[in-house]
Amino acid sequence: MFQVLDQLPADPILGLSAACRADTNPHKVDLTIGIYMDDSGVCPVFEAVRRAQQALDAEEVTKAYLPPAGDDVFNRGISELVLGRGSAALADGRVSSIQTPGGCGALRIGAEIIQAAAPGARVWVSDPTWPVHIPLLGSVGLQFESYRYYDPASHGVDFEGMVADLGRAAAGDVVLLHGCCHNPCGADLSPEQWAVVADMAERQGFT
């Protein structure tokens, strides 16, 4: 069965990390993968994280598995953290939250929902975007468009280009936006720019 499957290309970011590990330069700094490493190249467990784990272990009363949406208390807490406790959307019951196995798991579930609910929708992804986004979302048959995002000259957001490109997004399309610390460029929208994008979404009907 497996012999009919094509070998996937190597991940370019993980390949860079392997090349960095093989580099003998004593002054090298590995900035390829989004994790903190100490001077010896180890990703340590911070003391605050260790204590939090111990506190959770001490409070745990069951190993029963969670419902499909995950931990209700966690979902409510993360929704309040993102939207604010006074959010009208929360008060009106317009927010749904689920736990997923990481960001890629969230995107895969989102892709399946989009394909089931709006199979003709185009998904707009930033240029650049994290390399796994397009194959991950495309694996369910979604179609893509790109919008300008990073401006190498200013090392910031090409907001004029972004707005021009998203001006072509149709009602029912889906725009993949990075909430903070855009992956991979790190450039973020200002609150004023977020407001412009939100107005465009409402006016044009994209999600």
Language-model-detected regions and their locations in the chain:
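N-terminal "arm"/small-domain region of PLP-dependent enzymes with the aminotransferase-like
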Residues: 1-70, 77-80, 84
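Conserved core of the PLP fold type I
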Residues: 55, 60-205
